[in-house]
């Protein structure tokens, strides 16, 4: 599951030398994810990375998430509650970067360091740890361009485009597909959700019987799209590329259903998030961006991601 190499990250780079030994029991770091790990392998991997690295460094890690990735108010309330309880550092994947900006400012003003993972925030000077999502989506678009002739009908299943992650993936796919002459017939959001991805794909197929490829901004939506394509008896004519390389998607690739997916490194997002905020808690500094990388997953390597 998510078999990217588990880097020792900042420790390997020498940026946390001696810190594990001085981390104190009362140090508490909150990891606020956009969605719960249960039912979503991506967030489960983020949580595992954060908790395991926290244990290695001797800090308490509390992992929280709103009920859904669109429940902005719940995430804000969770963070405000933890600030009131005296949390020492925050690792944040914001559901809505603009809406979360005030509570991030509040934390920083109170001396509580914050880093962003997975999704960039809007607060100046806060480090982002995660994927270059636009480049990753462009990589996915390139797979489609290499497979299909110019002018082919293609579609994009977007995530939540008010989030920087959703916008970057939508933009990267759009720009890449446009550049190679694909005919983008639909760009619709499935809000990162499998059931919504299925419903949106059904709607797209109704008006586009000659569809040849779809880029799904995450694997959940891609797997939903595959269900719709199966029901329409069109899976054999549509090239499906996802994003995240979660275990279900890897299995789908091996079954010749999903054609490929783009792997992130969610484990390292969680682990490096904890390491990085601990660096700030100890008075250290960070780079503005820490890129956790991407790789194409197809039948040649999908077994490594199950």
Where in the sequence are the language-model features?
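A residue-level marker of the well-folded mature domains of exported/periplasmic proteins
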Residues: 3-6, 21-306
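Bacterial N-terminal signal peptides
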Residues: 9-20
